[in-house]
């Protein structure tokens, strides 16, 4: 596992020093080669106790690690078309940012020490900020970058203070130890727990601290949107799972407020999605609603909640990343993301419309999509916590189905505008990109045991 992280360091160096014509090829081939160790990890029954010092892998981290590694070559594949006009130095920086970001994510998911996890967690800020502010499409990208940086830093500071306090009290930040009873169920545990998970709630994000996400998604280039929706949001869910597993029931005493916000966020985000006219904005707000269910599953503190959140995070990473790719595919040809101006795509690109159809169905958790299994298991855990939660979850499910059908219907059906009838055809690169999102999403339906 140490070699896997070092591989990304070597790939960053390779992208910097290679000749001009080989920058993208080195990045793509290197990222594909680094996928090979990930396939080996999937077939190994690894526990937290049989991995090397400072690095770990278990059922919590393995799926997200493989997801991060899988998405890197797809991000490079999606970005190559609109980056060819950039100067060589900017192309090197762009590819280097994506590789470095993936390496930091892999390190965060494999860290066995909370301090190492925090360093990797914060290391994702700078490359993501560069992707948004340098390669965003509109002038509003600077405001989006400011929101992203402000929310991330403000949320992360209490986490650092809590980690320092934990080391002072316990003398250890290891993830494989249990720290129940340190506070002796005093009122301090409530402050500690809120301080610890605030950074993760902002990263997910939870309804109420989600303002940075739609702005970042809308203004980011396609690679930024893919990594944000695919992996970065899951970093928050992973951190919550790790901290709650370490502290057990002691840390769950003050979770009711966040659970209530999560349930309310599912409903509110569904309503907001139905009012959107921008493709990327709708997909971004839908991510907040799905991650609210992840928050609910984790904060219940039971195995069903953890498993449901885990499956839902991986499923959402593939589905939302593909939806952003499909939205970008249309934006590159029409220079618009407006739903009212995107009608009739099924008449222009019929094969790609099948990708839209499948991903919309998966986004609404239609059987037998993998999203359905994650949502059902998380809902069972939430119902066990409070039977009244079924009201919010049922309403959220109806709204999710409504905005998924709204997204597909508004973009695919209707009469095509005359000025969009002579667009250049879909390339093999874009077909491959869509297929590489669909294949694992369908494969996991038959092999759910890989994530449990």
Curated annotation (Swiss-Prot):
Q: Which GO terms describe its biological process?
A: aerobic respiration; ATP synthesis coupled electron transport; electron transport coupled proton transport
Signal peptide range equals none
Keyword Manganese appears in the UniProt entry: no
Catalytic activity annotated for this protein? a ubiquinone + NADH + 5 H(+)(in) = a ubiquinol + NAD(+) + 4 H(+)(out)
GO annotations of cellular component type: mitochondrial membrane; respiratory chain complex I
Report membrane topology. Multi-pass membrane protein
Q: Which UniProt keywords apply?
A: Electron transport, Membrane, Mitochondrion, NAD, Respiratory chain, Translocase, Transmembrane, Transmembrane helix, Transport, Ubiquinone
Q: InterPro entries recorded for this chain?
A: NADH4_N, NADH_Q_OxRdtase_chainM/4, NADH_UbQ_OxRdtase, ND/Mrp_TM
Question: Keyword Electron transport: yes or no?
Answer: yes
Write the Enzyme Commission number(s) for this entry. 7.1.1.2
- Cell compartment(s), UniProt: Mitochondrion membrane
The entry's function note states: Core subunit of the mitochondrial membrane respiratory chain NADH dehydrogenase (Complex I) that is believed to belong to the minimal assembly required for catalysis. Complex I functions in the transfer of electrons from NADH to the respiratory chain. The immediate electron acceptor for the enzyme is believed to be ubiquinone.
**Protein name in the entry:** NADH-ubiquinone oxidoreductase chain 4
Gene name of the record: ND4
């Amino acid at each position: 596992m140490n070699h896997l992280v070092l591989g990304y360091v070597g790939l960053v160096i390779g992208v910097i020093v290679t000749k001009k014509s080989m920058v993208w090829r080195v990045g793509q081939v290197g990222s594909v080669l680094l996928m090979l160790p990930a396939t080996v990890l999937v077939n190994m029954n690894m526990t937290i106790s049989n991995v090397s010092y400072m690095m770990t892998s278990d059922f919590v981290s393995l799926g997200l690690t493989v997801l991060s590694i899988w998405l890197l070559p797809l991000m490079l594949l999606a970005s190559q078309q609109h980056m060819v006009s950039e100067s060589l130095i900017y192309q090197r920086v762009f590819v280097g940012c994506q590789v470095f970001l993936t390496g930091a994510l892999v390190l965060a998911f494999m860290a066995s020490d909370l301090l190492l996890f925090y360093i990797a967690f914060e290391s994702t800020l700078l490359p993501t900020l560069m992707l948004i502010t340098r390669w965003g499409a509109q002038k509003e990208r600077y405001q989006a970058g400011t929101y992203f940086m402000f929310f991330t830093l403000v949320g992360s500071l209490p986490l650092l203070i809590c980690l320092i306090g934990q080391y002072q009290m316990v003398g250890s930040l290891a993830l494989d130890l249990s720290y129940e009873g340190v506070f002796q169920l005093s009122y301090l545990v409530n402050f500690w727990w809120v301080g610890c998970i605030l950074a993760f709630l902002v990263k997910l994000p939870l309804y109420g601290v989600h303002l940075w996400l739609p702005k970042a998604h809308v203004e980011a280039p396609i690679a930024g949107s893919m990594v944000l929706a695919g992996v970065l949001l899951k970093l928050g869910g992973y951190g919550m799972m790790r901290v709650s597993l370490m502290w057990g029931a002691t840390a769950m005493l003050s979770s009711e407020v966040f659970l209530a916000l999560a349930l309310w966020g599912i409903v509110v985000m569904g309503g907001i999605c139905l009012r959107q006219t921008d493709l990327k904005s709708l997909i971004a707000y839908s991510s907040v609603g799905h991650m609210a269910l992840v928050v609910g599953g984790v904060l219940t503190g039971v195995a069903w909640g953890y498993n449901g959140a885990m499956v839902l995070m991986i499923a959402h990473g593939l589905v939302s990343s593909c939806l952003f790719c499909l939205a970008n595919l249309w934006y590159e040809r029409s220079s618009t993301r407006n739903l009212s101006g995107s009608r009739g795509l099924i008449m222009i690109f019929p094969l790609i419309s099948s990708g839209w159809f499948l991903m919309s169905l998966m986004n609404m958790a239609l059987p037998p999509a993998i999203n359905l299994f994650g949502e059902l298991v998380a809902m069972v855990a939430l119902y066990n916590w409070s039977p009244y939660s079924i009201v919010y979850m049922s309403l959220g499910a109806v709204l999710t189905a409504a905005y998924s059908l709204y997204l597909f219907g508004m973009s695919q059906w209707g009469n095509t505008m005359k000025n969009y009838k002579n667009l250049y055809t879909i390339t093999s690169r874009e077909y491959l990109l869509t297929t590489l999102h669909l294949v694992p999403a369908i494969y996991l339906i038959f092999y759910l045991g890989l994530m449990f």
